[in-house]
Amino acid sequence: MPEWVSNRLKPGGRIGADPTLVSSAAWERWAKKLAENSVYLLPIRNNLVDFIWGSSQPSYSKHDAHVWPIEYAGKTWQEKVAAVRTMVEGHGCDAMVVTSLDEIAWLLNIRGRDIPFSPVLRAYVVLTKSQISMYVPPNKLDLSVQRQLRTDNCYSAFCVRLQNYTSIWEDLRTLSQVWKKVLLPAEDEFSQGVSRAIYTAIPVDKRHVAQSPIMTLKSEKNPTEKEGMRKAHIRDATAFCDFMAYLEDKMADGENWDELKVAHYLDKFRREQNLNRGISFRTIVAFGPHAAWPHYVPSNVTSLSVDRSSILLIDSGGHYLDGTTDVSRTFHLGSPSDREVDIYTRVLMGCIDLAMLQFPHYLPIRNIDVLARAHLWQAGVDYRHSTGHGVGVYGSVHESPININWQSKDAKMFRVGYFFTEEPGFYQEGQFGMRLENVLEVVQNNFNSTHGPFLSFRIITLIPFEPKLIDRSRLSPQQKRWLNDYYSRIRSEVGPELRRLPNMKGYHWMMDRTQPFLVDCDSSAAVSLNHVFLLVLLLSLGLA
């Protein structure tokens, strides 16, 4: 954007932006880039787009927020507030402004429907040692939420004072006069940090910009949240397997399907699951050349017919009261080419190698990226997107602080209780694409090491891979054993749920695709995991 503007304005030109809608971090980047051409970025009070809309501007969501029950949250909101206050005090601050919507939802154990596919509500929270103020549109909180937050007669440190949503900026200017330091959340991966308007409402000498302590606490799931995520993924796998059996059965009967129809029915199967609260993002169903677009979403105009001639990629997920899912699977309903089998097998091997990793706790998150890419690199191919991201619990499907990308400058490390995706892929424009995505849980390893704690991953996505796209001769004995263990878990954990359904088609579909692999000791075609892990360690030490 700054480059485009700079090319159209003469030196000395000025451009305005609404500081309530632009993060402070983005504002500073824009201002710096524009200044290189003597163009100046200025805050404007009246939003031009709002003015153009006039009376025809769509209204905000009128859906009420609702309580997220303690049996899924695992901790009371008062416990969370106490923990955040301790961390804020550790920063030497006596107040914090919370702007990230998923952080507000997590902190207060509430959920909303203000943003499509995200269970959050529009609000701000100002937290001090003795008060909690929530800036929220009128009539947004139903009585159950108000009772939980003790909004009536609020005179203690553990009740919430409700304020007008648009009063936040003026209140901050007033309140900051008595504060010594104010913690303002910094930009971090999928969190934009505070807006420019909030940043400038706090005097310069009182600003303390740092990683949000709520982000840190939220990303390390508690025991209740961990168990909920595991259970949600079992139900999600049940819906997915049952749908795929239904799709293949209908296509065998000659029924016509297109991308949009596949997405519609998969969403329907998910919504029928217990505790489901909708989909976690717009379902991606991409057939043939459309699968070469990583973020393609079908529409009435673009939807292709689905048949047996090419690759079918499905990237989808759901929200449940006890968890959030995100899964990608690639299928071929006909006879795949040798090229398609080769690429799919390489993508799968990357998934397995990453999932098998055991590593010291000090290994930076970014460095595991090479495990997912190594087998593709051997063929001279790569993918441009990151390999993975954090996942919330009935929250944001893209959760900070995890972003797995070897090019990242961030040196954050994994913590027990993180949930994240691994999603290597391949995209050949005009022909086909494929991606495999699983959610993994970070767990403590039982190594008794002099180098401190070791960590490993537990896969919680429980959906079979496409057997006709796997070249078994390329898999190492380790990889085959991992697949056998994985398929055994699918049968034992998802199988009982599929058997409870009115028909057994989903169960038979799952059983068909989880046949065990014969493990030999002569798979020399596969790259040794040890060699790839050595590369990871070299990268972490800056020696490669």
Residues covered by each model-derived region:
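A short, hydrophobic C-terminal helix/tail in secreted or cell-surface proteins
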Residues: A526-L534
